[in-house]
Amino acid sequence: LHMIHLHWYQYPPMNPMMYPLLLIFMFITGIPCLAGNFVTIWVFMTTKSLRSPANLLVVNLAMSDFLMMFTMFPPMMITCYYHTWTLGPTFCQVYAFLGNLFGCTSIWTMVFITFDRYNVIVKGVAGEPLSNKKAALWILSAWVLSFSWCSAPFFGWNRYVPEGNLTGCGTDYLSEDALSRSYLYVYSVWVYFLPLLITIYCYVFIIKAVAAHEKGMRDQAKKMGIKSLRNEEAQKTSAECRLAKIAMTTVALWFIAWTPYLLINWVGMFARSYLSPVYTIWGYVFAKANAVYNPIVYAIS
């Protein structure tokens, strides 16, 4: 109880029907997410032709999504069943830490996937090919940096507390302490705004390169008096373009999933009177649904 902010005490308990709905949602998303990401990992790791440096990033993305749902799914089922957080203050902090860690790792892995597509499509032969060593370094960087940032609340820079709905835990966005708020400012930049800017930058040039390539193919085909010009190299480039579209879709879905949680944090800091326990549900509902999207997108590819 000492971890629950006084702001939440002014609200009556949530409608009891919300908890069965959350249970159903978690079951519908949890099982497909675990199965989908496990299959993605298994297929990429056991199929020799898919063991490329770029696909190491895909495997890491599936791994972080799998671990997110694996660690979030059971506690959410338990707390929804009991209508409150029953797993103690220590596990509340661990739960919030793991959710942030795997979420942060996922977004930076997708940023690296986007940057790899940028390198292949925009720079082409002039770009340095992604090697296994470089892919492993990117993956290690995503985990180490994410772990560092997400560990900060354990050392007094912000803290992990129960959400207003008492079925999950997250960062303390209701504290008025300047040090605590500074963590949310920096974390928002690191996990949301910086990846967003990098992604937009890469895709602006990717789209330009794809458009220029397709126009060149059409013009060349017209000069030769044929409907299309698709040699082996063109087919390879077309495949790279399809992969770029898949990566762009995945990143877009990630930002759609995490934007509500970001907004909840900022509303909690600057306009808490508009924030009720029911609204806090949508933040992690969208965030956890993100872990389901990625295996679906990559399965289609």
UniProtKB/Swiss-Prot annotation:
Matches recorded under PANTHER family: OPSIN (PTHR24240)
Keywords, comma-separated and alphabetical: Cell membrane, Cell projection, Chromophore, Disulfide bond, G-protein coupled receptor, Glycoprotein, Membrane, Phosphoprotein, Photoreceptor protein, Receptor, Retinal protein, Sensory transduction, Transducer, Transmembrane, Transmembrane helix, Vision
Membrane topology (Extracellular): 1-18, 79-92, 156-182, 268-278
Membrane-spanning residues: 19-43, 56-78, 93-115, 135-155, 183-204, 246-267, 279-300
Gene Ontology biological process terms, A to Z: phototransduction; visual perception
Keyword Membrane: yes
InterPro entries per record: GPCR_opsins (IPR050125), GPCR_Rhodpsn (IPR000276), GPCR_Rhodpsn_7TM (IPR017452), Opsin (IPR001760), Opsin_lateye (IPR001391), Retinal_BS (IPR027430)
Gene Ontology molecular functions: G protein-coupled receptor activity; photoreceptor activity
Modified residues (N6-(retinylidene)lysine): K288
Pfam family, one: 7tm_1
Cysteine pairs bridged by disulfides in the record: C92-C169
Topological domains annotated Cytoplasmic: 44-55, 116-134, 205-245
Family statement drawn from the similarity comment of this UniProt entry: Belongs to the G-protein coupled receptor 1 family. Opsin subfamily.
Membrane-topology annotation of the record: Multi-pass membrane protein
Cellular component GO terms, alphabetical: cell projection; plasma membrane
Residue positions with a glycan: N165
Name of this protein: Rhodopsin
Motif interval(s): 'Ionic lock' involved in activated form stabilization: 116-118
Oligomeric and partner information: Homodimer. Interacts with GNAQ.
Record PTM text: Contains one covalently linked retinal chromophore.
Main location: membrane
Ranges in coiled-coil conformation: none
Subcellular location: Cell projection, Rhabdomere membrane
Function: Photoreceptor required for image-forming vision at low light intensity. Can use both retinal and 3-dehydroretinal as visual pigment. Light-induced isomerization of 11-cis to all-trans retinal triggers a conformational change that activates signaling via G-proteins. Signaling via GNAQ probably mediates the activation of phospholipase C.
